[in-house]
A protein has these predicted regions:
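Ligand-binding loop in jelly-roll beta-barrel domains
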Residues: 81, 89-109
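Short acidic-glycine-tyrosine-enriched beta hairpin
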Residues: 10-11, 74-92
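Glycine- and acidic-residue-biased ligand/ion/polar-headgroup-sensing regions
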Residues: 56-58, 62-68, 73-74
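Conserved short histidine dyad/triad with adjacent acidic residue
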Residues: 22-24, 39-54
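A short, N-terminal "cap"/entry segment at the start of jelly-roll beta-barrel domains
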Residues: 1-37
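Conserved hydrophobic/aromatic beta-strand scaffold that supports enzyme active sites
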Residues: 38-42, 60, 76, 84-86
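A generic "binding-loop/recognition-motif" signal
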Residues: 45, 56, 75, 91-92, ...
Length: 109
């Protein structure tokens, strides 16, 4: 069982120093428990997450910098800095950086 402990995960640091590079994006995990997971993500220009579904959890993004385009349950949308994106469980979604600038986000489930 993984429960939360009090503390601070510093900027540019992941839990236990972990950082992942997946499909050209950088993911830095910020918290992880049995009930919640959050991570900071950087999407360089031209990178994307292909459409997929999460069967067991809702997913959220808070856009920190830049712009991301989304396929949300078949509809095309976009979000910019300050926007919160809601990705309900069981609904298909894809994430695309079609801009010329990196986008930075905070994800959580």
């Amino acid at each position: 069982m993984r429960t939360e402990i009090a503390g601070i995960t510093r900027a540019n640091e992941g839990i236990q120093g972990i950082t992942w590079s997946i499909l050209g994006q950088t993911y830095v995990p910020k918290s992880l428990t049995d009930n919640s997971f959050s991570w900071h993500a950087t999407f360089p220009p031209g990178t994307f997450v292909p459409p997929h579904i999460h069967p067991d959890q809702d997913e959220y993004l808070y856009i920190l910098e830049g712009r991301l385009d989304f396929m949300l349950d078949g509809a095309d949308e976009f979000a910019t800095a300050g926007d919160t994106v809601r990705l309900p469980m069981g609904k298909p979604h894809g994430i695309f950086n079609k801009s010329q600038q990196a986008a930075k986000t905070l994800f959580w489930v």
